[in-house]
């Protein structure tokens, strides 16, 4: 295996495993992606296709900044305070980066991950262990 040709990595979210009343639609679609990836891994595993899901937690992205802005507007607060407060809720004390998520995807597409299939891996700074 030289590249991520036979492997498939689906990007879901920790919201797919940990329900949040404010994210019902988002969480439901991400949960469906987790289930689909597990089913596809079973179906195509005998063909040598490895399928996994990556579940990012709080990752500092433009999408999260938009969400933080909406939360701040709804509560009469500041977007910066929402971001700071949520980052503090992560056991490692900060948001993750898109590069950290990409590093996991790169690993899953490498020979080192040739026996990993049908699983969901969280990239969330330990937050899932505290939910």
Feature map (PLM): residue ranges:
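Conserved SDR Rossmann-fold cofactor-binding beta-strand/turn motif
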Residues: 50-56, 60, 109, 122-124
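Active-site "substrate specificity/gating" loop of NAD(P)-dependent dehydrogenases
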Residues: 19-23, 28, 45-46, 64
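A conserved structural motif in NAD(P)-dependent oxidoreductases
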Residues: 78, 90-101
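Short, flexible catalytic-loop segment of classical short-chain dehydrogenase/reductase
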Residues: 56-66, 70
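Residue(s) in the substrate-gating loop at a strand-loop-helix junction
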Residues: 13
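Short, small/polar-rich loop/turn modules that mediate ligand/substrate recognition or access, typified
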Residues: 45, 50, 116-118
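Short C-terminal tail/terminal secondary-structure segment
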Residues: 18, 94, 106, 117-131
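Active-site helix of classical SDR
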Residues: 29, 37
């Amino acid at each position: 295996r030289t590249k991520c040709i036979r492997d498939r990595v689906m990007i879901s979210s920790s919201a797919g495993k940990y329900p949040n009343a404010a994210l019902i639609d988002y969480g439901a679609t991400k949960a469906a992606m987790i289930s689909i990836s597990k089913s596809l891994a079973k179906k195509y595993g005998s063909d040598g296709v490895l399928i996994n899901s990556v579940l990012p937690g709080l990752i500092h992205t433009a999408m999260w900044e938009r969400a933080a802005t909406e939360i701040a507007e709804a509560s009469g607060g500041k977007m910066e305070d929402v971001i700071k407060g949520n980052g503090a809720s992560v056991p490692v004390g900060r948001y993750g980066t898109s590069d950290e998520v990409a590093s996991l995807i790169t690993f899953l597409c490498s020979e080192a991950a040739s026996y990993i299939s049908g699983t969901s891996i969280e990239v969330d700074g330990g937050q899932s262990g505290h939910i």
